[in-house]
Amino acid sequence: QYWREVPTAGRLGLFALVAAATWLVGARIADGAEPALIRLRGALWFASSAAAAALAGQVAGDVAHARESVVWLAAGAAAAVQAGLLWRLRDRPAQHLACLAGVLVAAGGAAGIAGGPAAVGLVVAAVGAAWVAAGWLAVLPPPVLALVGGGVAVLAGAGITAADWSDAAPLLGLAVAAVFVAVGVATVRTPLTVVGLVGGFGYLPWTIGHFFADSLGVPLAMLVCGVALLAVTLVVLRRTSRAVPAH
């Protein structure tokens, strides 16, 4: 309530101050500093990227009076550019995550200008898939974060399409989760397998509830599917433990 009473100039000034202050404080921490300080720098710069996104969104919305999709595009682009410059493909997980979030928001906003939720979801999923591929090839450091972040984006994108494709969305998400589990197990990429399992635990109940909501066998089906997912999890854990060499 109080935030709404703050003038636009005050909001812009506050966001600009936070973005600049957190960036400057983080910039004082050198790469050779203690690990705790390096993590602090990552958190500060993440906050700076978030403030830059809020500033850009505020300008687009309250100053330019742009439509909602353009506001998301501006906010995401600002975060992606600022975080990308701080990241510069180095081992900086927080900046990697901030850049990915910015790219996803910007891509979703751009898709929203021309289409509806289905277009937004598909574009977000496509960006996530590209991020997974880059993590697979170890192009984006750290690769584990690229696999996990991109995988989550693909699953989220499938869910976003539900506003237009209520029947197809849960099936699409479940298919993506199954592919992640299968590929992760076959190639011993545990992060991708974990993302697939988490997606399965989310999309499987959704799929069963959506298509069989009036069936008396839903509780039994949920139980069987839950047991199946737990069995897959145990298999993955056993394969992973065997793949790790003994020291």
Roles of regions detected by a PLM:
Residues 1-247:
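Alpha-helical multi-pass membrane segments and their bilayer interfacial helix-loop junctions
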